[in-house]
């Protein structure tokens, strides 16, 4: 097992295990037997899903599990009562707090054959197997492109998989498109971090055999050292209801999805990125929750979020494991004005462009994974005190996908919270919608639904403010252009008294 994956394995603590949790749903029912066949043919082809973990104080190893018992990993269950959203959230929360069986490969799917008018399933995967991006890649490998009800219903899972093999492809077009999209450098952050990381890794090997180049290596590493000093100098996040002694009891909730086009409308109107708009909406939601539910004075308060940043090169997009770093992002929860909050978020993200924090944290995790397990806990706690939540934003495929011939209508995921952090926010865009989810230790957020219910209204306020502001700006621009044009006097015959009209008073036109 790699050092970084080992570090994630060791982060399990009394308050919970480091599991990624995903919930997906279809509007029409999926057959359990057919989904099981899909798992056999498409999921178990990943060797890591057939392997269990064997750990010792110095590291961990992957052990082949032989003939894997799929029945232990694919559990068919029923929801109590009405079998709706509330019941599915309760099941997801319970499973998020339960540990996976360490004697087996560390993943499990609970399939709900009847959820509303369709079906749903909850995937749990230990973070040492894959990060969020890799997990979504695995989930998408189980799907196929939405080809319409008639065609989708006519083909079963095995024939669709065989069809792709005959065409010489291993993944459906939406997955390849998504991988290509996500593997593009996400602004200067990834581009700079990848370049610097590659230089440092190469220099690290070279200096073992060429001590005379130590000065050059030191210059190349100075940026990383400086970034490390900045991170260490960050103060602990301020005390708030979101930081409490963790209980280990989880709560899960999600909101109604936002329209991605409306989010893009706001981003264009404000000159911000889509990510700026979404993170500003999260900040506004948390601020409103703290003020209204806890009577917490947020004036001037900034809470820090730990944000995962993908560091996979394009050629590594199809591999499992952990290839991401973390970045500490200030959330302006104390800014009540939605426009000011969006601009503050934009300024924060702009200042972080070119930051080496993602590569730095990946390097730190790799180092911790190579040290004895006893040394890891204090270091993780040191970093976790600098934030109040984990916020993950993943751009998913915009082409609708199907599984077992049924269209996927909802898609949520949550990454684990390490150390003393007890709140996690997830953002996933899929098929023209933006899905928000919240997972939290009950000691930090007793009722997560009370948080996510505020997200829609917060975005509506931002949308309205941006729209009104854009209209006002357009009117001012038109007036400015009109005032700047010289008037041309037209010659005309002097009107007769019968044709004269009274000019409207100035200001009424």
Roles of regions detected by a PLM:
Residues 1-4, 12, 17, 21-421, ...:
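Soluble acyl-CoA-dependent acyltransferase catalytic core bearing the H(X)4D motif
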